[in-house]
């Protein structure tokens, strides 16, 4: 359930982009009429309308996520606050400057922030962030926790680079597809690989 909740802004970004992409002239007119005050020059063109509207949707969705959690008295994860800050700043820049480059950098920056957090927890604070997040759900040797930590660091670094590669090498619609399907697919594959690694080790420990 949490996975779907976390995925919601990405899904809404995808849907908003595809709807606007299917009727760019109407999307441009709608964006100019209702959100022109947020855009430099006050006018939105058909080519840029899909990504600008999708960006506004994802900003609102992220604010709504945090608002929902706060209203229910639940803790807001640190990375969700970071994501809100990034999507507001970079998304706002995309809308104001008519430049999709800013929002395209957002996933990479978020991945690298998470990877840096994992690295700093190990290198500076001598703690294993993954072990802390797991909350004692698994009992593993320090070496295994260390390997898992570095696996996540490498994965976040790779995902940040992969996002930029797609963003700069392919049209925006391909990047939007990758953002949802590629990002989620790679995350699931990595999680599966990590699960296989853990299951093998846990079996060894049980024996």
From Swiss-Prot:
Plays a role in cell envelope biogenesis, maintenance of cell envelope integrity and membrane homeostasis. It comes from the Bacteria. InterPro entries: YciB. The chain crosses the membrane at residues 3-23, 51-71, 78-98, 105-125, 150-170, 178-198. Belongs to the YciB family. It is found in: Cell inner membrane. This is Inner membrane-spanning protein YciB. Its main location: membrane. One of its GO terms (cellular component) is plasma membrane.
């Amino acid at each position: 359930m949490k996975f779907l909740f976390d995925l919601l802004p990405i899904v809404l970004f995808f849907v908003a982009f595809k709807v606007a992409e299917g009727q760019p002239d109407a999307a441009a007119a709608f964006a100019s009429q209702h959100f022109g005050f947020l855009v430099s020059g006050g006018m939105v063109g058909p080519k840029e309308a899909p990504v600008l509207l999708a960006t506004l949707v994802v900003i609102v969705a992220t604010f709504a996520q945090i608002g929902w959690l706060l209203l229910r008295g639940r803790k807001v994860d640190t990375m969700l606050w970071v994501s809100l800050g990034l999507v507001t700043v970079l998304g706002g820049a995309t809308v104001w400057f008519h430049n999709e480059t800013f929002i395209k950098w957002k996933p990479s920056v978020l991945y690298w922030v998470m990877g840096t957090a994992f690295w700093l927890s190990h290198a500076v604070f001598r703690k294993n962030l993954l072990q802390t997040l797991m909350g004692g759900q698994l009992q593993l040797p320090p070496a295994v926790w260390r390997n898992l930590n570095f696996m996540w660091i490498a994965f976040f670094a790779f995902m940040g680079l992969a996002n930029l590669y797609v963003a700069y090498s392919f049209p925006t619609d391909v990047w939007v597809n990758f953002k949802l399907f590629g990002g989620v697919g790679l995350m699931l594959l990595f999680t599966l690989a990590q699960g296989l690694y853990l299951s093998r080790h846990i079996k060894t420990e049980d024996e």
